[in-house]
Amino acid sequence: MAVQKSKPTRSKRGMRRSHDSLKEITLSKDKFSGEMHIRHHITAKGYYRGKKVI
């Protein structure tokens, strides 16, 4: 089993955890339908950038 040589510092622990926080979802308004959707995702009606994809 691998064993560390020395205890990681508080700084290294913090740097490792820096990406663990939850981020707020960015919503965008579709230009064509006016519907709100998650950025870079299709709308609930199946449109992406004004084109029907589903």
From Swiss-Prot:
Cite the record's Basic residues compositional bias ranges: 7-16
Residue span of region Disordered: 1-24
The entry's keywords = Ribonucleoprotein, Ribosomal protein
Q: Which GO terms describe its cellular component?
A: large ribosomal subunit
- Please give the positions of the paired cysteines in each disulfide bond: none
Q: Is Ribonucleoprotein a UniProt keyword of this protein?
A: yes
Query: Which superkingdom heads the taxonomic lineage of this protein's source?
Result: Bacteria
Q: Which InterPro entries match?
A: Ribosomal_bL32 (IPR002677), Ribosomal_bL32_bact (IPR044957), Ribosomal_zn-bd (IPR011332)
Gene Ontology BP terms: translation
User: Any idea which GO molecular function terms this record carries?
Assistant: structural constituent of ribosome
In terms of NCBIfam families, this protein maps to: rpmF_bact
Family membership = Belongs to the bacterial ribosomal protein bL32 family.
Q: Which PANTHER family match?
A: 50S RIBOSOMAL PROTEIN L32, LARGE RIBOSOMAL SUBUNIT PROTEIN BL32
* UniProt-recorded name of the protein: Large ribosomal subunit protein bL32
